[in-house]
Every structure is written in C-alpha cells, then in structure tokens.
Amino acid sequence: MKLNMIAAAALMALAPYSALAETIEVKMLNKGEAGVMVFEPRFVSAEVGDTVVFLPVDKGHNAETIKGMVPEGQDSFTGKMNKEVSVEVTSEGMIGVVCKPHAAMGMVMVIQVGGADAPEGFLDAKMPRKAKEAFEEILAEGAAS
C-alpha cells in the first residue's frame, strides 16, 4: 500500500511536465515557401521534452542529425528514406538536421531547444556549401523572430 502511494505521488509530480510537452511537425517537401527541397518549417523552437516529427510529405527525403551539430545529452538520429521519424528533444542547445540526399541543395533545418543560441563552431561541421549557406540564412531568420 505504501509503495502504491509513493508511485502515485511520483506520477503526479511528473504529470505537469508530460502535459506541457508539445509535438512539432516538420514537413519534408520537394517544393515549399523557401524553394525546392526544403524542410518546412526550416527553424523550430522547442523545449526539453517536446517531440519533433518529420513527415515525408514528398518521396525521396530523410531527416538526420549532422555530426558536430547536436548538443551534449541529445541523441543523434538517422531517419530512413520516405519514413516518418519522431525525435524527443532531451537537451538544450541547437540541433542541425539534414536530408542526406539533398544536402548539396541546402535541404537543412534547425531545432532550437530552450531558446539557446548557436554555440561557437556550430557551422564548422563538414557540409556542402549550399547547406552551410542555408544554415546561415536559417539562423539569421531564427534570431530575427
């Protein structure tokens, strides 16, 4: 009986956090507001505990993290082609995401967790020129909003 009361108290203490968690949808598109081969939106703000779901609206896309663009404590992920991928945000910071087949076309996006700024060296990761230019544009837009 005592153990049940402790378990119930623990669940009640955690309930507000799970109730506040949001699900954020990101579409993988051949064409969107920002041009061709894009994530939409290209910049999202999330909080620890939120889930970001990448939706393969158009075929030929995936979503995966870029080495060196994931905060400590956050798991990297590699989504399969044409498959939905759900990612729980577990650490504050900035997460860089790419569609591997369309990296050279600049198909990238940023998840900002907890209002964090891009850490120094965030754009130092190895990536095609168009991807880096897209990240610079996305970060500038995100800072302005």
Question: Which stretches of residues belong to each language-model region?
Answer:
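Bacterial N-terminal signal peptides that target proteins for export
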Residues: 1-7
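N-terminal signal peptide c-region/cleavage motif recognized by signal peptidases
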Residues: 16-18
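Extracytoplasmic copper-binding redox domains, predominantly the cupredoxin/blue-copper superfamily
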Residues: 21-145
